[in-house]
A protein has these predicted regions:
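Conserved phosphate-binding loops in nucleotide/dinucleotide-binding enzymes
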Residues: 134
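AMP-binding/adenylate-forming catalytic core of the ANL superfamily
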Residues: 3-4, 11-17, 26-113, 124, ...
Length: 148
């Protein structure tokens, strides 16, 4: 497939082991043997031993009226390892609150998956050239003390 990353020996060592490329994808196999890509390992929050897939939380939040963009990521926590954090860019003319977001999530997912930290952003979330959210930049930009 590939020999490695150009001029990035650390990245090569992390992703290729004994000739096998570890893509970082998380998948499930259904009862018929079909494989479904669920998320990426990097896009999973490990909260107190529970795996929380960012894509699952994002899909629930996107169903809430007034959400233009959202991105879920892990926030370091001394007790649980990570907590769920979400940055939301509301649609123009809408009024979202942390309480309304948590209430919506509580009706559609397990309690431990509900975001503890919620940031309502005044600008669109940062993206790369292919349109993916830059979660690392979001983490650096946001302060847990400013979350709702």
């Amino acid at each position: 497939m590939i020999k490695g990353y150009l001029n990035r020996p650390e990245a090569t060592a992390e992703s290729i082991t004994d000739g096998w490329l570890h893509t970082g994808d998380v998948a499930r196999i259904d009862e018929d043997g079909f494989i479904f890509i669920v998320d990426r390992v990097k896009d999973m929050v490990l909260r107190g031993g529970e795996n929380i897939y960012c894509a699952e939380v994002e899909s629930v939040v996107f169903k809430l009226d007034g959400v233009a963009e959202c991105s879920v990521f892990g926030v370091e926590d001394d007790r649980l390892g990570e907590e769920v954090g979400i940055a939301i860019f509301p649609a123009a003319g809408t009024t979202l609150t942390a309480d309304s977001i948590r209430a919506h999530c509580g009706n559609h997912m397990a309690k431990f998956k509900i975001p503890r930290y919620i940031w309502l952003m005044s600008e669109a979330l940062p993206r790369n050239a292919s349109g993916k959210f830059l979660k690392r930049e979001l983490r650096e930009l946001l302060d847990v003390n400013d979350a709702a």
